[in-house]
C-alpha cells in the first residue's frame, strides 16, 4: 500500500497515542485528512465523528473525565483549533487529561496569508503548552509528554503536515484492541496532623477523595464528592457560622474550631464563608496544583493526615441537628405551593428517582447547586459536573460523552447502565449542536437529559443582579428569555422529547425511563420569578 510522508507521520503519531487512549473524537477537515484516515483504519480505537470542534472537544473532555484516562480530539488547522479553548480551560482547571491533536500548515506557510492558517503554537497559553511535531524523530515527544508527573493535565500536540496529504488508496485496517493503560500521577503535598479533639468539619468538593482518618468526621460534601459517612447539609453552614445558637433554653457553641477542605469546593457562599473565616483554623488537602483557599489563610496544606484525639459526641450531635434542620427546611420549601414548579423541584425529582448504578451529569449554574440542596451525593451514583471553571459550555456534549463512557464499560450487557443529565435551558440551547450525532456514530443507549426550562437565566434571580433596583433591565441583561421550542429542536435532531409542567408528571416520566433504553429529552417547564423568594425562604429556615 502506498502512503505519503504526511500519512507516515500521522500513523506514527497515532501509534504513540494508542497505548494510552481508547476513544478519539474526530472532526472532518482537509489538513487533518492523514490523521482521519489513519484513525478510521484502527481497530483498537473507538472513533466518534463530530462536525463542531467546540462540541467535539467537550465530548472528548467528558469521555476523559468519566473514564479517568486520556481522550484525544483531532481537528484541522485554523479556527478549528481555537474552538477547543473552552474545553482546554475546563480540563486544565479540573485536571482532566484531554489531548488536542491539531493538524497545521507547514511552517513556511505561516505568516504568508495562506488560507486557514494561523500561528497555532501556544494557542492555549499555559493551559496546554504546544508540542510541535514536524518530523518522525519528534514523535517520541508525545510519549515523553504523557509520561510526565503531571499526568492529569491537557496536552496540545500540533502536527505540521505538507502536501501531498493522502495517497489514492485507503490505509489497511490494523491495530488490535488490548486495552489502554493509564495511571493518574497525583501531587503529594505531604502529611499534616489533625486533632479531632477540636470541633472539626470537613468540606469536600470536586476532586475530593476518601481521606484515611477522616471517614467519621462530619462532612459537607458537594455532589461530585464521595458520599460521606456523617453528611452535613450545605445550608447548615449558615448555622455553623454562628458563634452560638440558643435552642430550647440551651446555648451551644456551633462554630467549628477547624475546617478541613478536601478537593475543590465552590458551590455555596455560606460554605465558602466557613472556609474563609480567619477565626477558624483551616487545613487544605489537595492532590493537584490547586490549593482551594479562598480566604488565603490556610494554616497547613497536605495530601494525607495523621490523626490525634477523638471527636466529642456533642459536636457530632450539633452537626447532625444542623444538617437535619437544613434538609427539613428544603423539603418544607419544596412543599410550599406558592413558589410554583421551580428548578429546585426538578432537581428533587431527578435525585429522588436515581437508583444504585445510575450515573448523573449536572451542568454548572443552578442544576448542580439545586442537586446539592436536595441531598446529593448518594451512595451508588457517580456524579460528574464541570467544576474546573464551571462554565455552561458544551453541556449537551458532556452529557452524551458521560453516557458513552458509561456504556463502554459494560459492552456485553443487554441494556446499558442508565445515565441521567440535568441541564438548564440556557445550557441546553448553548450547546444544541451537541445533539447532532451522525448515523454511523456510537450513540447513547440509555441517556435521559432533563432540561429545567425557566425560559432564561434563573440563577441571576438569586444573585445581586436580581435585586429590586435592577429589575427594569433584568430581563434583557440577565433573564434573557428566548421562547425557543425545545420540542421542535429535538425533532430536528431526531431525539425523543417529552414535555411536563408539574412535579408529578416529571416523576412519572423519569420512572418510565428506568424501564426502557434510548436517548430522551424531558423538558420540564418551570417558573423563575419566584426563585428569589424561594431562596429567601430557605435562608429563613437556617438563620
From Swiss-Prot:
Molecular function (Gene Ontology), one example: manganese ion binding
Q: Which residues form the signal peptide?
A: none
Domain of life the protein comes from: Bacteria
The cofactor note from the UniProt entry for this protein is:
Binds 1 thiamine pyrophosphate per subunit.
Reactions catalysed according to its record: isochorismate + 2-oxoglutarate + H(+) = 5-enolpyruvoyl-6-hydroxy-2-succinyl-cyclohex-3-ene-1-carboxylate + CO2
Q: Does the keyword rRNA processing apply?
A: no
Pathway field of the UniProt record reads: Quinol/quinone metabolism; 1,4-dihydroxy-2-naphthoate biosynthesis; 1,4-dihydroxy-2-naphthoate from chorismate: step 2/7; Quinol/quinone metabolism; menaquinone biosynthesis
List the cofactors.
Answer: Mg(2+); Mn(2+); thiamine diphosphate
Give one Pfam hit by family name: TPP_enzyme_N
Which controlled-vocabulary keywords does the entry list? Magnesium, Manganese, Menaquinone biosynthesis, Metal-binding, Thiamine pyrophosphate, Transferase
On whether Magnesium is a keyword of this UniProt record, the answer is yes
The subunit structure is:
Homodimer.
Instruction: Give the HAMAP family listed for this entry.
Output: MenD
Q: Which family does it belong to?
A: Belongs to the TPP enzyme family. MenD subfamily.
Protein role: Catalyzes the thiamine diphosphate-dependent decarboxylation of 2-oxoglutarate and the subsequent addition of the resulting succinic semialdehyde-thiamine pyrophosphate anion to isochorismate to yield 2-succinyl-5-enolpyruvyl-6-hydroxy-3-cyclohexene-1-carboxylate (SEPHCHC).
PANTHER family membership:
2-SUCCINYL-5-ENOLPYRUVYL-6-HYDROXY-3-CYCLOHEXENE-1-CARBOXYLATE SYNTHASE, PROTEIN PHYLLO, CHLOROPLASTIC
Q: What is this protein called?
A: 2-succinyl-5-enolpyruvyl-6-hydroxy-3-cyclohexene-1-carboxylate synthase
Native species = Corynebacterium glutamicum (strain R)
The organism's lineage? Bacteria, Bacillati, Actinomycetota, Actinomycetes, Mycobacteriales
